[in-house]
Amino acid sequence: MAIHLKASHLGVAVLLLLFGGAIGAAGGGYLLSSGQNHSSPDSPVNTSPQSLTPAPVESNYRSALPLTLPRSAQDDQELNFIARAVQKIGPAVVRIDSERTAVSQGGPMGDQPFFRRFFGEEMPPNPDPREQGTGSGFILSSDGEVLTNAHVVEGASTVKVTLKDGSVLEGKVMGIDTMTDVAVVKVEAENLPVVEIGQSDRLQPGEWAIAIGNPLGLDNTVTVGIISALGRSSSEVGVPDKRVRFIQTDAAINPGNSGGPLLNAKGEVIGVNTAIRADAQGLGFAIPIQTAQNVAENLFTKGKMEHPYLGIHMVTLTPEMTKQLRTSGELPAGVTADTGVLIIQVSPGSPAAQAGLAPGDIILEVGGMGVKTATDVQERVEVSQIGEPLAIAVKRGQKPQMMAVRPGPFPEDLGQ
């Protein structure tokens, strides 16, 4: 991912790149820029004779300072919950450096709408045919199974995993699922520290959220906030092609944090830090760990994650949307409703076409549950079983009908 890069920062960005900053990623690069120099000159010193030769002072005062130093603040009893969580999970958080050959002249992230949506249009061209990037990840098993974001390692020719102790290991990408932005990497090692998995499905807004990762290449950075909201749909976040209900947090998530863990107050992983909104502050998003873990298990065992597929294009009707479709000529004949989920198009030969679904049908129920939005339909389909009948109730004209659709696997040629 990349930060908005403004003209006044270009010089700083180049310096950072030259000194090992992240400069792009397989599928999503990280460009560094900073608006200020954090190194400040020494404070002025008074060099007057008075200050150099102070008069001696006699005193019988006995220092009240203890003769022994107090107990270190690093003592477990002195640590706050944030420090304890970081101490617990920090060793299992890794840095992931990837490199690939550039395939686009449109900048480090090419023309991918996912990254343009989050980080804007001001992405400079990349003259180097190689794209390098830095992200984060965390260790799931002591023998080297690592979870990260798909955009961190997608298309990478080389992947290097750096442990907290500085050890650098060669990583092998075992699988990528772009529909959830989850990927898994394997390193050859033993007795590695591992994270503890929490329950993302039990979260409540207002709970503490702790992010660990390598933002802007600054290893082992910790930021803190709260869970701002739960269940953000991909369309709400701005990436409608992702089959994820995101956790929203105001914990700072920056380029390089991608793939790192989001923790609860106990130091358990509850999410995978994934994205921020460039047009706002304090809007970070993470994939719930239960979603990511399920995908990771499939990627490690099968090398891929199969998502159920119907083969329909649909929209959530509102009075405004109905009017817009009517004006553009895209409203199927006979449709008068201005609420519900309207099928606009059915892909030829798809499971939906084979079951008899047609443009103009308004979806009422999926799997016995009522649906009001296209997101509702997508989520009901996502939890269905490939090849098993899925009951879909529709209204065609003024008549309700029940269809039995057998979802197929999402076609690879659609690029997920």
Swiss-Prot record:
It holds the Pfam family Trypsin_2. Residues 320-398 form the PDZ domain. A putative protease, its function overlaps that of the related putative proteases HtrA and HhoA. Induction: No induction by UV-B light. It comes from Synechocystis sp. (strain ATCC 27184 / PCC 6803 / Kazusa). GO terms for biological process: proteolysis. This is Putative serine protease HhoB. The gene is hhoB. CDD domains: cpPDZ_HhoA-like. The lineage of its organism: Bacteria, Bacillati, Cyanobacteriota, Cyanophyceae, Synechococcales. Residues 35-53 have a biased composition (Polar residues). InterPro entries: HhoA_HhoB_HtrA-like, PDZ, PDZ_sf, Peptidase_S1_PA, Peptidase_S1C. Disruption phenotype: No effect in a single knockout, but growth is inhibited at high light (120 umol photons/m(2)/s) or at elevated temperature in a triple protease knockout mutant (hhoA, hhoB and htrA). Triple mutants are not phototactic. No effect on the PSII repair cycle, even in the triple protease knockout strain. Residues 35-57 are annotated as: Disordered. Belongs to the peptidase S1C family. One of its GO terms (molecular function) is serine-type endopeptidase activity. Keywords: Hydrolase, Protease, Signal.
